[in-house]
């Protein structure tokens, strides 16, 4: 099972190849709605889902990207998963597919730790040789929980650790010839070619699930400049995401956990924040509280940005697919109405 994500991750780092290689995958936009563009850590970029067979056993490989356009030149400190965001990958099976209801949801929750807070060196204290070693000052851990909406049960599948962000000399094994002086390694196609940090961060969870969470090259391809320049498209187009990273959560789900592989399944993802957050003078940290409120949603590529009118974009981000027919059907049927 471990090889399943070992194949997903290098493909996800090779722009465009994942879509061509997979049986069913979707990539989508990065700036869907006004409010979510102000919240990078909760801003969903892409959702991928495809079936793959490993050693006679089929799995549903899913992935959710967040934090668009991570500029490597800014340094490693800014780009991380948010402890205060609930990241979820939802899978619908059986009658739930047509109803737009999640049958099972998989939650990623993060916890950030510092080994030394009495230093200005936030991410790295020295060269990181292994994930979560003494040199990786800022380390993020995560828990994956399976929520079965049919029974209401919640089962923790396991935990993982996020590898360090790529920062040249501090993380040399991300780069060509394992040297921080060289550019980042190109996307790869085999397990053997994966970098050291990624290999160490792929975890096998309970019941045969496999997970990864960490920084990846952005595999989405779009000539965004020409699109927004009044559709003055270029041939060939230019990769606007080239050179930028994002943060990716990937989960391989055994198909027998979903009732077998002879069925149709629907996949979408959401991000949520706590309802309340109080800011006060003199506090080192604010603690959000209250129920989870959905702030981002991603499923069919480009639907929200490309078809939904401005007045409904934030509403789309904060609703479930179960109400799509009622609220957003008009955009699927009459595209001219929003141009």
Located regions from the model:
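Surface-exposed extracytoplasmic segments
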Residues: 25-339
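Bacterial N-terminal signal peptides
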Residues: 10-20
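Bacterial N-terminal signal peptides that target proteins for export
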Residues: 2-12
